[in-house]
Amino acid sequence: MKIIKNASQMQKIALRHIKNGDEIGLVPTMGALHEGHISLIAKSVKNDDITIVSIFVNPIQFGPNEDYLKYPRPVKKDKEICKKNHVDYVFMPSVNDMFPADHKTFIEVKTLQDILCGAFRINHFKGVATVIAKLFNISCADRAYFGMKDFQQLKIIEKMGKDLNFRTKIIPCSIVRERNGLALSSRNSYLSAEGKKRSLNISKSLKEAAEDFKRRDLNFVKKTVINKLKKIPGSEIDYAEIVNFDDLLPADKNTKKAVFAVAVWIGKTRLIDNIMMIKDKDS
């Protein structure tokens, strides 16, 4: 495994592999790797000749009052995880390398970037789309692996890839959860033991909603979850919305495949989660 810290060097290495006929898989991360990331790495190692894991805490996707400075950066542990899981290259660029002072180009995926998390984290998805586009170009990846926990992010990246004709194929990967149901996230480390216990009600409520969705109307499903989330001590809901799986538009009575997406504060920690919901065929 090699550590690469320069974008030009990483691109040259990737192009050499492409020339040799190798297929490249990219797992973009901000570090603080957990079992969710490891599942993405495993898929790339299985599918691709070369696996690149990028570790870059991207400043342009954080708002002015967000957690950029305190975001966990366990670099040594992350490197060990990558090595243990057969990663070929860990790409760890500096902020100045990715976004020098004269950087002026940003990517916006209109409409999709402005709803759900985008309504609360202004310019967040502009930062995400821009850094992912750069990583696609630097890595020359044939495939890139993204977890479905960040479902809105996944849809934005899919749309960007389609609209801008990127050669990189987006591979959606299932949410990885702890045994108790909590969706794995690097920000879970912010939670106290009590906060973690309280947060379990999020995934539990969504799981019950998926069952209700099969036969109950949307308003019932949505209100039931909101009421449950409100009862979590110390919680504050940013949003709890049922949207179409394909385009994130609000679901209606004709929707057969939906996603219930939520963002909830537990104390000072903002957690997102979602669940896919499918109507019974006879409903």
From Swiss-Prot:
CDD domains reported for this sequence: PanC
Keywords: ATP-binding, Cytoplasm, Ligase, Nucleotide-binding, Pantothenate biosynthesis
Major localization listed first in the record, in broad terms: cytoplasm
Catalytic residues identified in the record: 37
Gene Ontology biological-process entries: pantothenate biosynthetic process
Subcellular location: Cytoplasm
A Pfam family assignment: Pantoate_ligase
Record pathway: Cofactor biosynthesis; (R)-pantothenate biosynthesis; (R)-pantothenate from (R)-pantoate and beta-alanine: step 1/1
Protein EC: 6.3.2.1
GO molecular function ontology, one term from the record: ATP binding
InterPro entries documented for this protein: Pantoate_ligase, Pantoate_ligase_C, Rossmann-like_a/b/a_fold
Catalytic activity entry: (R)-pantoate + beta-alanine + ATP = (R)-pantothenate + AMP + diphosphate + H(+)
One cellular component term from this protein's GO annotations in UniProt: cytosol
Residues noted as binding beta-alanine in the record, renumbered to the chain: 61
Residues holding (R)-pantoate: 61, 153
Broadest EC class assigned to this enzyme: ligase
Assembly mode: Homodimer.
HAMAP family, alphabetized: PanC
Similarity comment text for this entry: Belongs to the pantothenate synthetase family.
Function: Catalyzes the condensation of pantoate with beta-alanine in an ATP-dependent reaction via a pantoyl-adenylate intermediate.
Further comment: The reaction proceeds by a bi uni uni bi ping pong mechanism.
Protein name: Pantothenate synthetase
Native source species: Endomicrobium trichonymphae
